[in-house]
Every structure is written in structure tokens, then in C-alpha cells.
Amino acid sequence: IGLESTVIDLTSKPKILRPGFINSTEISKILNMTVKYSSRSKAIKSPGMLKRHYSPGIPIKLNRKRAGINEAFIVFGTKYKNKKNTFNLSSKSSLTEAAKNLYKTLRLIKNKNYKMICVSPIPKVGLGLAINDRLKRAAK
């Protein structure tokens, strides 16, 4: 998979510090207790917890409906037309496929001459939480 592991803090009540491939429902089932994502931790408790991380070196704008001239457009799903500047993480609307393609797509765009990356909304459920987390860190 293209995303790193889920990071869980077990030093007190279990909480997810960084969402990954294994989601909170699966973790809750194994631990036999509710485990939720917590973005409130100010201390860096594990690798990959920096506020800015995974950045391609190009400004990134999230939750956009379109991209302009000289801007790459990262999209998700079936409603987007295949244009020169459009990079679909998953035309099948598969979050697993999107997660696998995320870093490859960011590297591909980085090697082109785009001035900015615009990202269409990605569902904020399941693996979409991890994708949005990495995009948010890359955009800072």
C-alpha cells in the first residue's frame, strides 16, 4: 500500500495518532473497545507526526472543484474527465487504489512544471481519512 502504517498511542486510553490502512473500526474490534482518531496531540510521539510532511515542494490546495492553467488537478472518482493536467487517484472510486496511487501521483506531478496542485475532495471515511491526513500534511 502507498500509505504508512496506522499509528496508535497505547500509553493511556488507546487513540489513533495517524490514520493508515488499518482503520479505527478494525482496531476497536481487536482491542474490544472504541478507539478514535485524535488530531489534538501537540507532542510528536512517533515518526511521521510532523505537521508538514510528505511535501512535493509545490503548493497544494485541498477540496478544489477545478484547477487553473499550469496547475495539476488530483481527483478521485468517476465524474472527472481525463484532461492533460488531471491525475485520477482512482477512477473506480476505490480508496484502496487511491491510497496506492497517492505518492506515485505526487512524485509524477513534482517532475512536471506545474505551479500548484489542486486536489478534489476525497471521502473522509475509512482509508480516506489516511489519504486526507497525508494530503493535509503535504499542503502545509
Regions found by a protein language model. Give the residues of each.
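Active-site-adjacent structural elements in enzyme catalytic cores
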Residues: 1-140
